[in-house]
């Protein structure tokens, strides 16, 4: 369909098995009021997770959640490792661990940790940050300079012999710029359609426009899925001990 020609490449799934309706980013969510009171600049690098000033002010999801996994992979990457060479990630976590107050296991618990003032900084999704900001709570989202990890809202028709043509049409409908704008405003999803126009207050909270979309990085899920069980056991021994 012609609509697929105006989508960002990052939403295209290899083998055309599905497509991303939009995307969110994993990066820093921080309490702007707290940072302002302290006179701190917004965080800008993954390695700042180890900054001693954040002692017991940091919340990170467990590795069983996607955001915690992204932390490990990105710390490996920015310290000379990768998904296939994860040791630098665990090594970097040794310096991060003293800063971690809690490992909230769900979005609700992460929101609670931030809203209670127990923590002032976390690694979280841009969409989650939008939802929290929409309540009036003073948070902002930062794309680390080395890249924020993209997380897609994927969609595909059910593969069956009598699949309705309407399923494809419904997916294509969702890529119309005006519908993409609704996804951005209500769900915090960065628009897949390059021609989508967003209101400034929405645009600043989602991955939007060539500059921000270019800051998104994808992780290698094929490698991660093979190693995840081992990494989880090691994380529980070394990080969440």
Regions found by a protein language model. Name each.
Residues 29-34, 74-78, 152-164, 182-183:
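A bilobed periplasmic-binding-protein/Venus flytrap-type ligand-binding module shared by bacterial periplasmic
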Residues 115, 120-138:
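A ligand-binding cleft/hinge motif common to bilobed small-molecule-binding domains
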Residues 90-96, 103-104, 135-159:
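Periplasmic-binding protein-like
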Residues 214-241:
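Conserved C-terminal helix/tail region of periplasmic/extracytoplasmic solute-binding proteins
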